[in-house]
Amino acid sequence: MADKLYQMEVQAEPQYVAEQSSVANDVYVFAYRVRITNTGSEPAQLISRHWIITDANQQVQEVRGMGVVGEQPHLDPGQVFEYSSAAHITTPYGSMKGAYQMMADDGRRFEASIPEMTLVAPRVLH
């Protein structure tokens, strides 16, 4: 089956960053760590990213760009790439999901889905 050639497993884990957040100013910062594993049989390079970030008010930010953290990693079968970044929203909870555009060494483009992450700040007492 051709699909097994072009497979990436994406795991993402968010964490609230209290030191960089400002509840009084409606700024909630979430760091996240992403692990991308080439589970297919074809080497491939991450070309670009597309994130959809939604806050509790259903305000959506779409973030698109080349690569991740300044890199366009090339992953051989079984190889893993990890990186960390952050997102800001204006409510204490929301979600993030998206996809990476990949290009296999044979020239085929495919998408690696980023599973939805729930962003939740701990309860803040006023």
UniProtKB/Swiss-Prot annotation:
Pfam families: DUF525 (PF04379). It comes from the Bacteria. Transmembrane segments: none annotated. GO terms for biological process: error-free translesion synthesis. InterPro entries: ApaG_domain, ApaG_sf, Uncharacterised_ApaG. Residues 2-126 form the ApaG domain. This is Protein ApaG. It comes from Chromobacterium violaceum (strain ATCC 12472 / DSM 30191 / JCM 1249 / CCUG 213 / NBRC 12614 / NCIMB 9131 / NCTC 9757 / MK). The lineage of its organism: Bacteria, Pseudomonadati, Pseudomonadota, Betaproteobacteria, Neisseriales.
